Each structure stands twice: as structure tokens, then as C-alpha cells.
């Protein structure tokens, strides 16, 4: 897929996955592992993909190269769903250098038994990789959401490569009828939400850049109305509610607390309130967390278990 004249999408879609990171339900729409190639006088590949799709990714890369050879593999984020293809790439393209933060190279030793000492290029905040006609300026983004993370900015086409920032659940070959925000919100608060102050820090850096395109490592490439996405991330990372409404989260064994919650929800709705109710024993925990941050009020209705409150209960708990 052509993003700009010289930047191509070479990522893959995963429709076999049921739980992303072993806990987030993506069984309906799958997951995308994004990767990109920048075709300057020199060629840089931005990130790899999950281990089950390395061959497909390398095939996509070969097609985009059209007979040329890559000069660099740029690693923005070392999580295995983005770094599993490193060894195969380095073996296939023995002349290529690998570009990453020092923290990423430390992880490579643990992952692959080497940090490619003869071929590595360590970069940090403010460093520039000149590709001839294009360049990547690196932006430190620690703890968004891993400590080694870098963003990079391509100034010619005004593209931000944002690692897991601005990511979204869902494969890219499926159109999400709910739009970007719903699954991007669930993704953000499940995976990145703990690190709001670090997201705020990188957003301040991004404010100084003329960004026309955002290329994340999950979800669609963002090309229009970028102010909306940046403003939304500012809201999420500053822990401000998006909407007026009430999230009620509960766990009930024998149904007594459930009945009380249903009565409360009905009474609130009768007063014109927007109410979102989650049974934490049965409903998707990530969706409950999503709505807890989305709305401006939260009710936690708890059973008791051995004299303590218990929202997540064991099988012999009683309310």
C-alpha cells in the first residue's frame, strides 16, 4: 500500500489471534502488525512483525523494494509482535545496519543472543538518519509503553512513526463500523493508559512538528483530521473524561447485588443519565476499564468475601 510516493506499508493482518497480549479479546476483528519502508536514496525499513508472519512480511518487503536492497532496519519498539522478524531480516540482508535505542539493543541480546555489534547504530533523541531525499529524526518516547521506545519524524512527507502510540485493535483489512475511537480507546487504556505522563511528554514534543500522517504499529495509518487524534490522546493521557455518563462495575454470586445494580441503573436512566453496566465476572474487563475512563462518574458495587470487599470473586464467595 502506498502511503506517499516513497513510503509504503508492508505490514500484515492476523485473523487467527483471539487474545492480544494474552488478555484482550480481538477474536472478532483480529490484529494488524504494521511495518513500513521508506524509499530514499537509501532505504529504511521501519519495524518488523509478529513471529507467525515473518515470511509474509519479508515477501511484502521484497515486493516494495522492486529489486533494490534495504540499508537500514529501524526498530522503534522491541515488543515481540514488532521485533520477531529482526533475525530473519539481518540474515537475508547482511549488508544492512540496524538502528535502535540503546535500550532496544540491550533487549536484542536477551531475544537473539546478539545485538549485532558490527552492524548496529545507536540513536537517541534528536539524532537524524539521512536517507537522501528523506530523513528520520528520532524522538524519545520512553514508557509509551515500553522503556526503549522511540518515535521518528520524516520531514519531507511530514510523517510521524509513532510505535504503539495511536494504535488500535483490529486488522486493517476489516472496516470497523464503530470507527477509530472505540477500539483505539480500549487499546489505549488497556496497554498505554498507565503511562499518561509519558504520553503527555511525547505529545508536547509532537506539538512542535508539522505532522500530516501518523503511522502507528497497530491499526490504520492516520491521514486526515490529525488534530482530532492528537486532542483525543491528550484527553486520554491527562485522565480527563470524554463524556458525561456513569459506569457501574460489579460482581455478584447469587444475584442479589446484580438485582441492586439493575435497580440503580434503571433509576439513573429514568433521570436521563447515560449508564454503562459491567459484570466483572463475565464481561470484557478491558471494555469496563475503557468506559470507566470514558465517563465522568464511576460506581463500584462489591460483594463481601471473608469480611473484605471483592469485585473479582472466587467461586465460593457469597454476597
What are these regions (language model features)?
Residues 2-5, 50, 100-216, 220-224:
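Metallo-beta-lactamase
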Residues 313-319:
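Conserved small/polar residues in nucleotide/adenosyl-binding loops
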Amino acid at each position: 500500500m502506498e502511503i506517499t510516493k516513497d513510503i509504503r506499508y508492508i505490514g500484515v493482518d492476523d485473523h487467527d489471534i483471539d487474545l492480544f497480549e494474552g488478555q484482550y479479546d480481538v477474536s472478532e476483528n483480529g490484529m494488524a502488525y504494521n511495518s513500513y519502508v521508506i524509499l530514499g536514496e537509501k532505504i529504511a525499513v521501519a519495524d518488523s512483525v509478529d513471529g507467525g508472519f515473518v515470511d509474509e512480511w519479508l515477501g511484502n518487503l521484497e515486493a516494495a523494494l522492486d529489486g533494490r536492497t534495504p540499508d537500514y532496519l529501524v526498530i522503534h519498539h522491541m515488543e515481540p509482535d514488532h521485533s520477531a522478524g529482526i533475525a530473519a531480516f539481518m540474515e537475508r540482508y547482511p549488508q544492512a545496519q540496524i538502528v535502535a535505542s540503546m535500550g532496544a539493543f540491550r533487549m536484542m541480546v536477551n531475544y537473539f543472543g546478539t545485538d549485532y555489534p558490527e552492524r548496529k547504530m545507536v540513536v537517541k533523541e534528536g539524532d537524524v538518519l539521512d536517507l537522501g531525499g528523506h530523513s528520520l529524526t528520532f524522538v524519545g518516547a520512553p514508557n509509551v509503553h515500553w522503556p526503549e521506545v522511540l518515535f521518528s519524524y520524516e520531514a519531507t512527507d511530514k510523517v510521524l512513526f509513532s510505535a504503539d502510540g495511536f494504535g488500535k485493535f483490529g486488522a486493517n483489512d476489516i472496516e470497523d463500523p464503530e470507527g477509530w475511537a472505540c477500539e483505539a480507546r480500549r487499546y489505549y487504556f488497556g496497554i498505554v493508559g498507565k503511562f499518561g505522563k509519558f504520553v503527555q511528554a511525547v505529545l508536547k514534543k509532537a506539538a512542535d512538528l508539522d505532522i500530516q500522517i501518523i503511522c502507528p504499529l497497530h491499526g490504520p495509518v492516520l491521514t486526515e483530521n490529525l488534530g482530532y487524534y492528537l486532542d483525543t490522546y491528550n484527553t486520554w493521557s491527562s485522565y480527563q473524561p470524554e463524556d458525561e455518563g456513569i459506569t457501574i462495575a460489579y460482581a455478584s454470586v447469587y444475584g442479589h447485588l446484580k438485582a441492586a445494580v439493575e435497580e440503580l441503573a434503571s433509576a439513573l436512566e429514568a433521570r436521563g443519565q447515560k449508564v454503562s453496566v459491567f459484570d466483572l465476572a463475565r464481561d470484557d474487563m478491558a471494555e469496563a476499564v475503557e468506559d470507566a475512563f470514558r465517563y465522568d462518574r464511576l460506581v463500584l458495587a462489591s460483594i463481601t468475601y471473608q469480611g473484605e470487599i471483592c469485585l473479582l470473586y472466587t467461586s465460593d464467595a457469597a454476597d
